[in-house]
Structure formats: structure tokens, C-alpha cells
């Protein structure tokens, strides 16, 4: 793969002259890197300096207040452990946010590409930089609120930087704690889920979960429905490693200090930087081998995809010349072949192969944002806003509607019959209203086993029914709000 030219001078901030030009005059966009919060992220070169940057292109119809908040927080940050912000452009219907480029990608990308979890030494080195980033943010009275391996980026030298401030928040003197449920379900601190108010140490809980994620490939509860996890995190004891005997006492103790359920007793970033597991961390040079390996795999896959696209185009041209083409006589068969090819490619990655729940449900949850205002880069809670009766974490599942609908439209022959059918469970299997379970004594062992086996699917069905009822109540309110906003704009 062709290497970008060496930078002529280090880019610190885009000049006023650069910001008045069209972005295409200032940058050469090279390739798409992936999806961030609210938009797609591209790799580009700043023409004047030759420096590689990342550009997040955000559709204007996205939540503009959240985007402005992300830019505001990034603008205020100046730390080698936080992704730098260079400037923004409006281009047609997109906002272009120009940021520091981290060539190795996220920690979760590297785990996926290599199909390997990280060693203790690698984890300690990454956590040391991450804690320095959190110490800086928390000193600035900012909460990241979405710490996970996917939001810790590595540059090619191995330096870890915090990224994706789409859901970050600002603490002020007049607001000691926040009450909004924001983040990604499996990484959330108990106090965030319970909406009892939280502060900077909520990020420390998420860091503890991230430590387990880096060691085991996925966070605790990743194999179960996120709604169930949301109920389990505040009530269950703090999670631990699946096989504690594989990990050192120092690492186990570090995770234990992060995952203290009481926020008052949880360690701070500054305290954790003095923990033996972090103090004994090795230099970033130990990460170069895994970074090189991950980048080589990524480049190889990119070349394979390009070849496949070229082959498909050639085959398509040949098919058009053939009067009895496969596409014409058996288009469904071709579709099935492509689906199988995609599945086999996905199976090469550990997380996609082992946990479909993880792939589909780890999106970032943003709740109650209507109750927050942006004012001079500072987030403030509106104390006069009416109490919301709806459990706020239900909003996260509204975001999954599109994915769920697309799954429903999948070819039925490619999957087992759905166990969520309304006809699967008799009504008399539901929990008795009076709470009297004495009737269970009269059932046979086989009937009891069937009931036990059916509990999880029944729960899934009831959760889905509850979600649908809330969605039906919520949509008219959203429609009315949209109508009012449109009238105000027209006025």
C-alpha cells in the first residue's frame, strides 16, 4: 500500500484562510475508516502540511446539539492522551469535523483483526495512557461517559488516546452530579443506570469493564440481552474475570478497585495511576508488534475486497453477454452464495463469530438529552423539566428498531424458527398475579424443566411487548414536537 508523504510541518490548528475554503481544496480524502457517533470517519491528507488527519462527516439532519457539544469539548482539550481537534467545515448537507488521525485504529479493532485478546503487559500499557487521558478530562470537570475499547485509539507508535466525545458531559460548580443515562449498556456504572446522579468516577467503572473486555474479548453480560444486563448490573455483585486464575494478583486487584459499586469508595484516575499494575507498565514500544500485525491484516483484507469487487464487475459484464445467465434464471441462488461468503469472512473474527448479541447491541445509548442544554460549551441540567415516567434506558432499544426490522426480513430458511412467537407459550405459563407458586409442586420434573427452559424466551417476548407499547406512546409525542419545531422554523 502506498505510504503518505512525510508531514512538512506539524498541524496544530487549521488557519482562518483554510477554514474559508472548500474542504476539498484543503484536504485529499483517501478512504473510509468506519463509523463514529453520528457520522462516517474518513482518512485524509492536509495538502499544505502533508499531515494525515481523520475527518468525521456528519449529516446536518443528525442531532446538531450533540455534534456541537462534541466539538466544544474537543476544542477545550489539549492533551497528548486525547484526540486533537483541528477545525470544522460545512459542505452541502454535511458537517466535516477534522481531527487527529490514529493510524492503528481502536483497541477493539486490533482485537478483532488479530482474532486475539491482549496480554497483561499490553493491557497495562494501554490503561496507563487511558488513565492519563481520564485524569486530564476529570481535572477539566468533564465526563467521557462512553469509555470502552472501541473509543480508545492507538497511533502507529502505540500511544493510546481517548476519542468519540459524542456523549461526553461537563460538570459545573452548580451541578455536582448528572442524572442522565448515557453510554453503552454493558460498560455502564450502576449509578448511571439507576439515575441516582453520578460524577467522573462513572468513567472508572467503565474502564474496569474495558479491562475485562481487552483481556477476554468482550465485556461481562455481552452474551445476554442488553435489557437484562441493565437490570443485572445494579443488583449483581461486581463482575470479575471468567477464569481468574489466568490473571495476576495486581491485574485482578486493579479491576476490583475500578468495579466498586459505591461511587464514593471507587478509586479515581489519579489514584489508579499509582496502582502497582499501572506503575509497572512497560513502554509503548511493546505495542508495536500487535499494531503492525493488525495493520497488515487490515491492508490484506482491503486488497482482497478490492479484488472481489473487480471480479464481481468482470462477472457482471460476462453475465450481460450471456443470454442464459445465472442472474436471470436463479437470482436467489446468487444471493444465497453471497450471504454464505459474507458469513465465512465474519467467522474469521473472534467477537463477530462468538457473540452475535455483542455485534448488534453495543451501540452508544444517549438518554434524556432533551433535558440538557448547551451553553458556552457547558452542559446544564434543566431542573424544571417534568419527571419522565418512562424508564429512560428504554430509548436505547428504540435505536435497535431498524436492526430488528431488518432481521425480521431475513430469509427464514437461513435461521431457526423464532422462539418469540405469541403461540409458543400457553397463557397459564405466565407468572400468577397473586404470586402463589404452590401449583408447581404438582407438576412433573419434565414439565418443570420445560418451564425453566422457556423462561428466557418468555422474558424476551415480554420485553419486546413492553418496548412496543412504550414506542406506541412515545411516537405521537415526538411527532407533535417535530411539528412544533417546523412551525417555529417556518415562522
From Swiss-Prot:
Residues bearing the modification N-acetylmethionine: 1
Binding site for ATP: 33-41, 56
Catalytic center residues: 146
Pfam families: Mst1_SARAH (PF11629), Pkinase (PF00069)
Enzyme type, top EC level: transferase
Cofactor(s) listed in the protein's UniProt record: Mg(2+)
Matching InterPro entries: Kinase-like_dom_sf, Mst1_2_SARAH_domain, Mst2_SARAH, p53_tetramer_sf, Prot_kinase_dom, Protein_kinase_ATP_BS, SARAH_dom, STE20/SPS1-PAK
Coiled-coil residue windows: 291-324
Activity regulation description: Inhibited by the C-terminal non-catalytic region. Activated by caspase-cleavage. Full activation also requires homodimerization and autophosphorylation of Thr-180, which are inhibited by the proto-oncogene product RAF1. Activated by RASSF1 which acts by preventing its dephosphorylation. When autophosphorylated at Thr-180, recruits STRIPAK complex and promotes PP2A-mediated dephosphorylation and inactivation of STK3.
GO MF terms held by the record: ATP binding; identical protein binding; magnesium ion binding; protein kinase activity; protein serine kinase activity; protein serine/threonine kinase activity; transcription regulator activator activity
Occurrences of domain Protein kinase (ranges): 27-278
Keywords tagged on the record: Acetylation, Apoptosis, ATP-binding, Coiled coil, Cytoplasm, Kinase, Magnesium, Metal-binding, Nucleotide-binding, Nucleus, Phosphoprotein, Serine/threonine-protein kinase, Transferase, Ubl conjugation
Localisation: Cytoplasm; Nucleus
Catalytic activity, reaction form: L-seryl-[protein] + ATP = O-phospho-L-seryl-[protein] + ADP + H(+); L-threonyl-[protein] + ATP = O-phospho-L-threonyl-[protein] + ADP + H(+)
Comp. bias intervals (Polar residues): 326-343, 381-390
Assigned protein family: Belongs to the protein kinase superfamily. STE Ser/Thr protein kinase family. STE20 subfamily.
This protein's name: Serine/threonine-protein kinase 3
Amino acid at each position: 500500500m502506498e505510504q503518505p508523504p512525510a508531514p512538512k510541518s506539524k498541524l496544530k490548528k487549521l488557519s482562518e484562510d483554510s477554514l474559508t475554503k472548500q474542504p476539498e481544496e484543503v484536504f485529499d480524502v483517501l478512504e473510509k475508516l468506519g463509523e463514529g457517533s453520528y457520522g462516517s470517519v474518513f482518512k485524509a491528507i492536509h495538502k499544505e502540511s502533508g499531515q494525515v488527519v481523520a475527518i468525521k462527516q456528519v449529516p446536518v439532519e443528525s442531532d446538531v446539539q450533540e455534534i456541537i457539544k462534541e466539538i466544544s469539548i474537543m476544542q477545550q482539550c489539549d492533551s497528548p492522551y486525547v484526540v486533537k481537534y483541528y477545525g470544522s467545515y460545512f459542505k452541502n448537507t454535511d458537517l466535516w469535523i477534522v481531527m487527529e488521525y490514529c493510524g492503528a485504529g481502536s483497541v477493539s479493532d486490533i482485537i478483532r483483526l488479530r482474532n486475539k485478546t491482549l496480554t497483561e503487559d499490553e493491557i497495562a500499557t494501554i490503561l496507563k495512557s487511558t488513565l492519563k487521558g481520564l485524569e486530564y478530562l476529570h481535572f477539566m470537570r468533564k465526563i467521557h461517559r462512553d469509555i470502552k475499547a472501541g473509543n480508545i485509539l492507538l497511533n502507529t507508535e502505540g500511544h493510546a488516546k481517548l476519542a468519540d466525545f459524542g456523549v461526553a458531559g461537563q460538570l459545573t460548580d452548580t451541578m455536582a452530579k448528572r442524572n442522565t443515562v448515557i453510554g453503552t449498556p454493558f460498560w455502564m456504572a450502576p449509578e448511571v443506570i439507576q439515575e441516582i446522579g453520578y460524577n467522573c468516577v462513572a468513567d472508572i467503572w467503565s474502564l474496569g469493564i474495558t479491562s475485562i473486555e481487552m483481556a477476554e474479548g468482550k465485556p461481562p453480560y455481552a452474551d445476554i440481552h442488553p435489557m437484562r444486563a441493565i437490570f443485572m448490573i445494579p443488583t449483581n455483585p461486581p463482575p470479575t474475570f471468567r477464569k481468574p486464575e489466568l490473571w495476576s494478583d495486581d491485574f485482578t486487584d486493579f479491576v476490583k478497585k475500578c468495579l466498586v459499586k459505591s461511587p464514593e469508595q471507587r478509586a479515581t484516575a489519579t489514584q489508579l495511576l499509582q496502582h502497582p499494575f499501572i506503575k509497572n507498565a512497560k513502554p509503548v514500544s511493546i505495542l508495536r508488534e500487535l499494531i503492525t500485525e493488525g495493520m497488515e491484516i487490515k491492508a490484506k483484507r482491503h486488497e482482497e475486497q478490492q479484488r472481489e469487487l473487480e471480479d464481481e464487475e468482470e462477472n457482471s459484464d460476462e453475465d450481460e453477454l450471456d443470454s442464459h445467465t445465472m442472474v436471470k434464471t436463479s437470482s436467489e441462488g446468487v444471493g444465497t452464495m453471497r450471504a454464505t461468503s459474507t458469513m465465512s469472512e465474519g467467522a474469521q473474527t473472534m467477537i463477530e463469530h462468538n457473540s452475535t448479541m455483542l455485534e448488534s447491541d453495543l451501540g452508544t445509548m444517549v438518554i434524556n438529552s432533551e433535558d440538557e442544554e448547551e451553553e458556552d460549551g457547558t452542559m446544564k441540567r434543566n431542573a424544571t423539566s417534568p419527571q419522565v415516567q418512562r424508564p429512560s434506558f428504554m430509548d436505547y432499544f428504540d435505536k435497535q428498531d431498524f436492526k430488528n426490522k431488518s432481521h425480521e426480513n431475513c430469509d427464514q430458511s437461513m435461521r431457526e424458527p423464532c422462539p418469540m412467537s405469541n403461540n409458543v407459550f400457553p397463557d397459564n405459563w405466565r407468572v400468577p398475579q397473586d404470586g402463589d407458586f404452590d401449583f408447581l409442586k404438582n407438576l412433573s420434573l419434565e414439565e418443570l424443566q420445560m418451564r425453566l427452559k422457556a423462561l428466557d424466551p418468555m422474558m424476551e417476548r415480554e420485553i419486546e411487548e413492553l418496548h412496543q407499547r412504550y414506542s406506541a406512546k412515545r411516537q405521537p409525542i415526538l411527532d407533535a414536537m417535530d411539528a412544533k419545531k417546523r412551525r417555529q422554523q417556518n415562522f
